[in-house]
Regions:
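Conserved G1/Walker A P-loop phosphate-binding module
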Residues: 1-65, 78, 82
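Conserved C-terminal guanine-recognition region of P-loop GTPase G domains, centered on the G4
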Residues: 42-47, 70-126
């Protein structure tokens, strides 16, 4: 039986970079929002029974943009087994709004703080 894990988070938070590392894929990564506008599926390296879904970057589950519609529909209709919420450590307040919405879906959520090197470089702490 397959395990389905969705990568969710704000635009430009590192979801696709993590997706590529986990799956061995080579999806395009850009340093601006809106690069991923559709969901991408891959299998975890050395664990073929784990499906990783790279969702478009979104700020909320309110379906105002195409990216939010794609991500929301997958999370609510397809209901993955777990959500890996990638958040940008340099802007926690903006990122945690989506985190709150994700936890309300009743799906297990793991929060991964990304860009911690930039946080440390700025002299900040989490």
């Amino acid at each position: 039986m397959d395990i389905r894990i969705a990568l969710a988070g704000n635009p430009n938070s590192g979801k696709t970079t993590l997706f590529n590392a986990l799956t061995g894929s080579n999806q395009f990564v850009g340093n601006w929002p809106g690069v991923t506008v559709e969901k991408k599926e891959g299998r975890l390296k050395k664990h073929d029974h784990v499906i990783i879904m790279d969702l478009p970057g979104i700020y909320s589950l309110s379906p105002y943009t195409l990216e939010e519609v794609v991500a929301r529909n997958y999370l609510i209709q397809d209901r993955p087994d777990a959500i890996l919420n990638i958040i940008d450590g340099t802007n926690l307040e903006r990122n945690l709004y989506l985190t709150t919405q994700l936890t309300e879906l009743g799906i297990p959520v793991v929060v991964a703080v990304n860009m911690i090197d930039v946080v440390n470089k700025n002299g900040d702490k989490i």
